[in-house]
């Protein structure tokens, strides 16, 4: 660390979640392949829970939607602003603009054409899923035939939900 400081690095920002764990995890490309395969294999509507700040995971969901001919509905708090900003900054890309649809337009599509991307409030999607499961979400209610696909590790603070 001292050597890095001498080289003129002012700050080091890193992600060390689960760094002390000995459990081997899949590579990001393997995760992306798994997301695409899971979405491809499901015939009904898919509700994906992701953290809003994980742009890599969101890109993987967009890529899987494009590969499987589905549309993505953004339902988390502020996720539309996050996605639009990330696209403008070239941190996210869409194969085509029609990939994203508004929640009010979901009824125009068959269930097998939809991925609902729930990122929740403050980037935590699990509470949004809970609301969907009890009919209190503003756009979506989980129904028979839906696949709820959690592509993040839920925070420990919400484990009781």
Predicted regions and their residues:
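Binuclear metal-ion centers of metallo-dependent hydrolases, dominated by the metallo-beta-lactamase
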Residues: 4, 20-109
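Metallo-beta-lactamase
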Residues: 1-24, 148
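Short, small-residue-enriched loops and turns at beta-alpha junctions
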Residues: 19-23, 124, 155-157
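A cross-family glycoside hydrolase active-site/sugar-binding cleft signature
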Residues: 15, 49, 151
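Residue-level preference for the first positions of well-ordered beta-strands
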Residues: 11, 45-47, 71, 113-115, ...
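Conserved small/polar residues in nucleotide/adenosyl-binding loops
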Residues: 159-161
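Short beta->alpha junction loops/turns
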Residues: 51-54, 122, 154-155
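A contiguous, basic/glycine-rich beta-loop/short-helix subdomain that forms a polymer-engagement track
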Residues: 75-145, 149-153
């Amino acid at each position: 660390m001292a050597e890095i400081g001498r080289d003129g690095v002012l700050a080091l920002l890193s992600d060390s979640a689960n760094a002390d764990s000995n459990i081997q995890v899949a590579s990001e490309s393997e995760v992306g392949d798994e997301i695409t395969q899971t979405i491809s294999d499901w015939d009904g509507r898919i509700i994906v829970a992701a953290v809003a700040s994980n742009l890599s995971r969101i890109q993987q969901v967009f890529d899987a939607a494009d590969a499987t001919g589905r549309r993505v509905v953004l339902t988390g708090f502020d996720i539309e602003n996050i996605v639009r900003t990330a696209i403008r900054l070239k941190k996210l890309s869409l194969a085509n603009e029609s990939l994203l649809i508004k929640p009010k337009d979901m009824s125009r599509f068959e269930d097998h054409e939809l991925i609902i991307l729930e990122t929740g409030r403050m980037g935590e999607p699990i509470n949004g899923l809970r609301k969907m499961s009890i009919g209190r979400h503003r756009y979506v209610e989980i129904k028979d035939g839906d696949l709820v696909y959690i592509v993040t590790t839920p925070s420990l603070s919400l484990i009781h939900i």
